[in-house]
Structures are given as structure tokens and as C-alpha cells.
């Protein structure tokens, strides 16, 4: 088992990474020395079938536990589901010394974390991520639910007390989910580590990724995020760099309809557009043709669907939480590992987006 310590202004907490470590859940949580009068275990219906009862039984050996499974998919990050979980917490008589346990991917982590951040003005929670994608979202304390007009518009900063990342869970993921998670790994490499990106560029297919490579990806990805979050917990500065590819990515997700495209596929499109703008504005020397061919080979979409208008995407970006005073904030690269924040008027991004989409149609 490997471990990392996340250091932020508000809290220091451990991340445990290893195969099969969920089976030591009770011991790992006990080592945190939290009061934990009761536990509310929140998972989703698919994860529940594989790991829900196992973790429930392990935790129940030491604490009173209630398990709730929400529907799988981005649609669960809704106000209705948030209120349902608050009701479950109240009816189970959670108190300020209770703890919420999130077992699942990024959706469950975001939702359960937001419930924890707001119940009785904030109680403890612990993350048990089960997907490659959630190596990113489980660390850093950003928790949220969606609004019909945009992704993650209703949320808070609320750090977990620990993250228990059992890499054994990744072995059961379908290729689509592996690809989605890999996009966030690629993002971390682009913004911070050229040698890591060069390693990733050697991947020929999702199926060829070994267990050892997965563990190393998770460790490196979390290490990069930990470094950024330790310097900027509340996204006042460099933490915004972690949004590379996400401005267009979130717009695509919202416009397609949540669940119609994976987060990672949308972010892959967003990164390709960000590289295009980086080339035009900053003369970024990244070989976009090589990157596009590699991403296509791994199964990522090449372009935004033609039936989705540029105007609709701009509207979504204008509602993005990073937009300030009608000015769209974009994360660009002047080279791999060197990030710049740039502000654009909507008409500028519309022009770049139309150019990029025309390039993709050739």
C-alpha cells in the first residue's frame, strides 16, 4: 500500500492507494481517530452490486451504519437526490460527530461530499473511489451537484478526512469508464509533467493498460493534484489550472445532456480545443496532429457533434462558474507543463471554436 498526505490550509489528510485495501476499511477508518458515532454509506446501484454489501458488513462490525444506493450516472447529482439523502441522514439520526462514507465514482463522491458539507453545517466524510476518473475528484474537497443550466454550479469546498483508493476496483471497469478516467490522468500530465505525458503517449489501447500501470497513473495523478491543491485550496490561483479542458468539456456535457457523453470524452474534446487556442494565442509547440491521432486511437471522440451549435456551447460557457463578468476564463498551455490563464470575450471564443470545428470537418 502506498500513501500520500494532502496538505491544505484547512486540513491535512491521508490518501491510501493499493490493491484490496477496501478489505481493511474498518482498520483504516479507526486509524483516523474520528468520533464517528454513526456512518451513512452512500453508493450507487451498480457499485452497490459489487462492493456495497462487503463494505457495509466491514463497517458495521465497528459502527452503526445505514447504506443508501442512488441511481448510477450523472443524473444522480440533482437537487432532488440531494434532498433525499438529507432526509435519510435526518431519519437515521446522524449528528455532528457522524461521518458519511462515499463509495463509488466521481458522481457519488461529489454528491455525498456535498451532503456532508451541508448537513448540520458540515460533518466529516471519507472517500472510497472505485473508478479511474475519481482519482481526480476524490482529492481536493470540491463537492457539488448539477443545475439544469450547468454542471457543478451548486457546491462547496469540503475536504474529506481520508481517501481510500482500492486499485483492485479498477479491474472491473468497462472500457468506456476506463477511457473517461484516463482523460483526467492525461490532463494532469499536460499541465504538470511532460515526461509523464510521454509515458502515456506510448499507450496503444485502453485494454493494454496493466494493473501496475494503473496504480502508477493513480499515484502520479493524485500527486500532481495534491501539489496544486496544497498551494491553492479554494481555486484563487493555480488550482484553476486543473480546469484544463473543462470549460468546453462542461459545456459539451450540459448541451449533450448529462449521461449522453462521459465526462472524460467531453474533457478530451475540451483539451483538444484548448491546445488549438494555445497554439493560436501562445504559439504552443505541442504537436496537435499527433495528440489528436493518439486520442482517436484510444477511442475518444474527434469532434463535437454537428447538430450541437457553437452558439449553444458559448451560452453554456457563459454560465460556467469560472466565467467572470461575462468574460470566459480559459486554461491554456504555452508548452507542456507550463500553464497560463487567459480571459476571452464570448465572441473571441466563438470565433476560435468555429475555426477549430471547421478544421475537424476537413
Curated annotation (Swiss-Prot):
**One cellular component (GO) term of this entry:** cytoplasm
Report the record's Gene Ontology biological process terms: amino acid biosynthetic process; aromatic amino acid family biosynthetic process; chorismate biosynthetic process
Q: E.C. number, please? A: 4.2.3.4
Q: What class of enzyme is it?
A: lyase
One Pfam family linked to the record: DHQ_synthase
Gene Ontology molecular function, alphabetical = 3-dehydroquinate synthase activity; metal ion binding; nucleotide binding
Domain of life according to the entry: Bacteria
Q: What coarse category fits the chief subcellular location reported for this protein? A: cytoplasm
Q: Briefly, what is this protein's role?
A: Catalyzes the conversion of 3-deoxy-D-arabino-heptulosonate 7-phosphate (DAHP) to dehydroquinate (DHQ).
**What's the protein called, per UniProt?**
3-dehydroquinate synthase
Its organism's taxonomic lineage begins at:
Bacteria, Bacillati, Bacillota, Bacilli, Bacillales
The gene name on file is aroB
